[in-house]
């Protein structure tokens, strides 16, 4: 069968799993980033004109949103992602963001998911980066897939029987806009409102 468009075939797709503390960026149409989130946040950023995008995945060390020492971990994750996009040819004023995660997964983590979500929204607002979609909070884990070239995102909520990576705050600093499709795991149906937050 001959393809009538320039979309990559399944055999050409490269899926990179983005773990907590990671930051990745690409301009390849064959690249897909995937991650699973509980209390963590992932930020998907894209310059749709330059055709470059990237993802980070972070968890603040505590729920204290006034603790500057802790907030710098989230700021560092954001700055790494923005700088990676700029190196690939993005223009800062064109960068768009979509943010996901921040669920209340366990009592042991307390309100850290809520704090992560609040940090991400405040950071984007303060830096003048347009947030075109978000799905934050709730008590279910999320599986995210992101196409950095176009900014397309898919989200699927996971059930209690799914294995979610154990999330632990990381204290070590590293040196150095398409559509959103939402799926519910149990009926695999596309959710009608891509901006609606879970209850």
UniProtKB/Swiss-Prot annotation:
Signal peptide: none annotated. It catalyses: L-glutaminyl-[protein] + H2O = L-glutamyl-[protein] + NH4(+). One of its GO terms (biological process) is chemotaxis. GO terms for molecular function: protein-glutamine glutaminase activity. The keyword Hydrolase applies. Its EC number is 3.5.1.44. The keyword Hydrolase applies. Keywords: Chemotaxis, Hydrolase. SUPFAM superfamilies: CNF1/YfiH-like putative cysteine hydrolases (SSF64438). Pfam families: CheD. It comes from the Bacteria. Probably deamidates glutamine residues to glutamate on methyl-accepting chemotaxis receptors (MCPs), playing an important role in chemotaxis. Belongs to the CheD family. This is Probable chemoreceptor glutamine deamidase CheD.
